[in-house]
A protein has these predicted regions:
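The conserved cystathionine-beta-synthase
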Residues: 13-31, 38, 81-98, 104-106, ...
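Short hydrophobic/aromatic-rich motifs at helix boundaries and adjacent loops
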Residues: 6, 24-26, 41-43, 61-63
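A glycine-centered beta-loop-beta connector
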Residues: 27-29, 35-53, 94, 102-118
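Glycine-/small-residue-rich active-site loops that bind phosphorylated ligands and cofactors
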Residues: 12, 42-43, 62, 79, ...
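Tandem CBS (Bateman) regulatory domains
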Residues: 1-9, 50-82, 86-95, 116-155
Length: 155
């Protein structure tokens, strides 16, 4: 099965010059915790921001969310996948990078969607596919492993 069959294409995004307060409002209003960051120049994905990233950046910099640009908190080490990749490849990337969501990007780096572990779980539940359920469980187990200080620094 291809990532394109499970990914969500209606994705909220932001650019790196927006303020964390604006992105926090977007997350609150749409009940999301992950936003791809898009370059205003090229339209390519240049990072991702999570609710956790924003909170920790504001806390440790001693500033309000409205004082900080997204670029001060976004992750630039982007784990992504292509729409034509097999779901197993996406699961492997999620496991390796210990993430629940992946931007789905075209060859030019532009966002075409997002695929999440929840998408895999919903698919497994709909189809009652034991092999797929096992793959999802293994991926979740890998994602949930505690990070070492070294892997946290790489993220």
């Amino acid at each position: 099965m291809k990532v394109s069959e499970l990914m969500v294409t209606d994705v909220f995004t932001c650019n790196d010059t927006e303020l964390l307060g604006d992105v926090a409002r977007l997350m609150w209003e749409h009940d999301i915790g992950f936003v791809p960051v898009i370059s205003s120049e090229s339209g390519a994905v240049v990072g991702v921001i999570t609710d956790r990233d924003g909170f920790l950046a504001a806390y440790f910099q001693g500033k309000m969310l409205w004082e900080l640009p997204v670029r001060s908190a976004m992750s630039t080490r982007i784990a992504s996948v292509s729409a034509d990749a097999e779901v197993g490849e996406a699961e492997s990337i999620m496991s390796e990078f210990q993430v629940h969501r992946l931007p789905v990007v075209a060859k030019d780096g532009k966002l075409v969607g997002v695929v999440s572990l929840n998408d895999f779980a919903r698919k497994a539940a709909r189809e009652a596919n034991e092999k797929f359920e096992e793959e999802v469980a293994v991926t979740l187990g890998a994602i949930c492993q505690p990070r070492t200080p070294e892997t946290r620094a790489e993220a």
